[in-house]
Amino acid sequence: MAHRRYADVVGTLAILGGTGAQGMGLALRFAAAGESIVIGSRVLERARDAAARVRAAVPAAQVDGLENLDAAALAERIVLVLPVDGLDAFLGSAGPHLAGKLVIDAMVPLQVRKRVAELVAVGDASSVSELVQSRVPAARVVCAFKNVPSDALQDLARRLEGDVLLCSDDDGARREVATLVEHVPGLRPVDAGPLRLARYVEGLTALLVTMNIRHKALTSIAIVGL
C-alpha cells in the first residue's frame, strides 16, 4: 500500500481569524507539523498574504488563504482565533458550516489596563468556549491552545514548552485535538475536564499575560505530577 501523508489522512485544518498573532503562530506550527492549512480572514487579500508568509517560512507547507466563511465550509476541522467582540454575529452566520465539525476554540477575551490583563464578559456565557457551544450546539467544541504565547508560536526557531489544557464535553473530539497537539514538538496535551472548566483556562491566560508584562517573559503552563 502506498504511504499516505499525515495531512492526507486527517484533512484540511481551517484557522479562522488566522491573520492575527495567535492565528499566524498556530498556522506556522501546524504547517511545520505537516498539516494542510487554510487561513481564514474577513478580507481575502489578508488571508492570501498570511498564507504566503507561512509558505515562505515553511517551504513545504500546504497552505491557502480564503475568506472566513469559505474556509469554514471547506474544512472538517476548525480553529477559532477571531476577535471576540464580533464572535456572536459570526457564529450566527457561520453556524451551518461548523455544525458536526471539530471546532477548536483558542480565543481568550482579554483587556489590558495599567499593565494588568483581565477577562471581559462574553455575552451570556461564562467562557468563550461555552458561548461557541451554546450558539452551535451540534459543533464538537474543544477549548485548546489558550495558554501558549503567540510570540513563541511565531518563532519557529524557538522550541515550545508547556502543556495544552483541553476542555470538552466530547471525548472523541478531545482525543482528536490531543493528537494534533502531539504533532507540535514541545507541547503536551492534558485532559482538563468538561467544557464548563474552560472559564478557568481562560483565566490562567490573564494571569500569564500579566506575568509576561511584569517580567518581560513568555510564560506558559506545565502541569507537574502527570
Segments (PLM) and residue ranges:
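Short beta-strand and adjoining strand-loop segment in the mid-core
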Residues: 116-125, 154-172
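NAD(P)+-binding Rossmann beta1-loop-alpha1 motif at the extreme N-terminus of oxidoreductases
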Residues: 2-53, 183
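A short helix-to-beta-strand connector/capping loop
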Residues: 57-64, 137-140, 187
